[in-house]
Amino acid sequence: MPNQEACQADYRKADDAIRVNGLSVISLCTEIVNQLRTQKKGTLVVITSVAGERGRQPNFVYGAAKAMVSTYLQGLRGSLMKDNVHIVDVRPGLIDSPMTTHLKKGLLWSSPESIAPSIIKGIGRKRHIIYAPSYWRLIMLLVCVIPETIFKRIKI
């Protein structure tokens, strides 16, 4: 995960973060989708993040990159319906991984192993968006309804 303060201080760091977490994902998806479109079937599963749902103070550059990918997937999903290609946006919450080793862990953290079964289940059920763990759907619903006048004052 990119360092937010470094991204704010140096546009090149923000640019790198957006390329790594956003544009590289879209470029890879483009290559895969071309093959799936030719096959006229398939499923593309992409891991984004709940961070892409609202610009939060601690990580808005990372969140912007993930929002870009989720928006891309939403449009792609509609454009590939006729080709029998299913697009899945997996939105994990706080996951204990090499990317998050520097962060303090708490109650809402999960391991990759603990969320994998729900992701596999969601793919099998042809879900469009999978929150992992599923309680993040409710958390993000609440985060997204906080009025901007309040949200801009809190660091969550």
Predicted feature locations:
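Conserved mid-core segment of classical short-chain dehydrogenase/reductases
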Residues: 1-15, 58
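Active-site helix of classical SDR
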Residues: 29, 65
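Residue(s) in the substrate-gating loop at a strand-loop-helix junction
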Residues: 49
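Active-site-adjacent segment of SDR/Rossmann-fold oxidoreductases
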Residues: 54, 75-86
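Active-site loop immediately N-terminal to the catalytic Tyr-X3-Lys motif
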Residues: 54-60
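C-terminal helical subdomain
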Residues: 89, 104-141
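Short, flexible catalytic-loop segment of classical short-chain dehydrogenase/reductase
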Residues: 92-102
